[in-house]
């Protein structure tokens, strides 16, 4: 009997023990066959041979360190790291797409627009010679063409001295003026005095102070224009550099842990914690964020430069009014023609000896200090307004680099409220670690992210930003300092134009001249007067007549001539002379053509 009781007790104990053991066993893994992981990995990276069919210990893993059986292999881990870095590069490029397009578009627009301004300035000058000094053509056309070619090259960065450009123009013009206008009847035997005349031009100051005035205006406006273009091109380089950064292995491991290690546990639908994403991104992009300080300074310095680009610091105003100043300089020569002819006749006639260098300069050769006058002009949508619009758009990106980590996290799948999310190791109810800020100066408590200095390419781009910022500050015009005192003393009246006006160019002749700025930006329209189609160039061939007469003003033509240019990059140039200038050639083809005399 006692044996039977003991046997029964043992049976009961065994049953209870089995029950307890059953309760102590851990729950089975979410995907005991790794089927979901295999399906996902196949879509991400073809290669099912690397995915285990059932969970494995994963002792060889280095990033997705398992707390139990895992559906990841070492080869899968490597593929995840590669994919994570590629994803990061794509997110970074997506973040900068709008900014990059903004700068590229405007750099192309302004470069083309500056070329259009130069081309029109050349046309105006040629037309002025044709209508006022026909005896000087075509020699004058050649000299004017060479001058404006040098202007274009200078804007694009060529190492050309502006003073030399202007001196060469007047050195070349004076022999033609002297032999064709002042002494048209000179015999052939004395026409070989060009070198003597070129030298006499400077020593006798036959054009008065107009060459110096042009040097000052052209030099200041072109220097600012060139640095403006250089700054835009550097902005493109900065964006391109950060767009194509190669992230470190440490960063790749952290990105993999954040985006893909949850898959190894079969947690396919779990999102990374938002706070965890911020920490990882600030660590990965610590070097990039170091650009922020210099990027902010770049935009603010560019704004300061743009704010000073008016009057003599605006190449649009200076070049489009250059024909008027050249016209005035020739009038000055004519006004003093008698005395100049006498003096130069003694120095250069029948002689190649350079005795003129010690010649007496008559004191009564003078410059009329009120020859140049300035008038208000009608406001148009000019290069100046376009520049200001660009600056306003750029300022919306002034925090671009400091905001990059947050931007990328906001554009990738994360749990924004940090609840039921992946913290890099496991699924948690709430993530509590605070994201670090301010680039590399903070430690992240993430041993995987080793704090190093910026990548060499980032250091190089920072150095370039420092350099361009220094140039921008150097070239920026202090507020209120627009016209040099020396210019006022030489006859440039500056009182007629306010600081906010876009157009201030010289007059021609004795009276005030109201000039409408010729260059406008239109959304989809482009009207461009070709160099050879300048109103004064008809003597070069009647074959251009049809092209000239088909050009109309806005007021007279039913619909403007439309020229579609490359996507999102447009340059529009439009002429409307009818109401303001004596020569309404574009509005009234029958009228004499050319700018005012």
Curated annotation (Swiss-Prot):
Modified residues (Pyrrolidone carboxylic acid): 25
Source superkingdom: Eukaryota
Record-linked InterPro entries: Glypican, Glypican_CS
Family membership noted in the UniProt record: Belongs to the glypican family.
One Gene Ontology MF term: peptidyl-dipeptidase inhibitor activity
Subunit structure, interactors included: Heterodimer; disulfide-linked. Cleavage by a furin-like convertase results in production of alpha and beta chains which form a disulfide-linked heterodimer. Interacts with DPP4. Interacts with FGF2. Interacts with WNT5A. Also interacts with WNT3A and WNT7B. Interacts with hedgehog protein SHH; the heparan sulfate chains are not required for the interaction. Also interacts with hedgehog protein IHH. Interacts with CD81. Interacts with Wnt receptors FZD4, FZD7 and FZD8; the heparan sulfate chains are required for the interaction.
One Pfam entry name: Glypican
Secretion signal span: 1-24
Protein's name according to its UniProt entry: Glypican-3
Positions where Phosphoserine occurs in the chain: 351
Reported function: Cell surface proteoglycan. Negatively regulates the hedgehog signaling pathway when attached via the GPI-anchor to the cell surface by competing with the hedgehog receptor PTC1 for binding to hedgehog proteins. Binding to the hedgehog protein SHH triggers internalization of the complex by endocytosis and its subsequent lysosomal degradation. Positively regulates the canonical Wnt signaling pathway by binding to the Wnt receptor Frizzled and stimulating the binding of the Frizzled receptor to Wnt ligands. Positively regulates the non-canonical Wnt signaling pathway.
Modification after translation, per record: O-glycosylated; contains heparan sulfate and/or chondroitin sulfate. Cleaved intracellularly by a furin-like convertase to generate 2 subunits, alpha and beta, which remain associated through disulfide bonds and are associated with the cell surface via the GPI-anchor. This processing is essential for its role in inhibition of hedgehog signaling. A second proteolytic event may result in cleavage of the protein on the cell surface, separating it from the GPI-anchor and leading to its shedding from the cell surface.
Keyword Secreted carried by entry: no
GO CC terms in record: cell surface; lysosome; plasma membrane; side of membrane
Membrane topology: Lipid-anchor; GPI-anchor
Compartments in which it is found: Cell membrane
Organism (species): Rattus norvegicus (Rat)
Main subcellular location of this protein, as a coarse class: membrane
Membrane-spanning ranges: none
Keywords annotated in UniProt: Cell membrane, Disulfide bond, Glycoprotein, GPI-anchor, Heparan sulfate, Lipoprotein, Membrane, Phosphoprotein, Protease inhibitor, Proteoglycan, Pyrrolidone carboxylic acid, Signal
Glycosylation sites: 123, 240, 417, 494, 508
GO biological process: animal organ morphogenesis; anterior/posterior axis specification; body morphogenesis; bone mineralization; branching involved in ureteric bud morphogenesis; canonical Wnt signaling pathway; cell migration; cell migration involved in gastrulation
Disulphide bridges: 34-71, 64-261, 72-264, 196-348, 251-284, 273-421, 277-409
Region (Disordered): 533-553
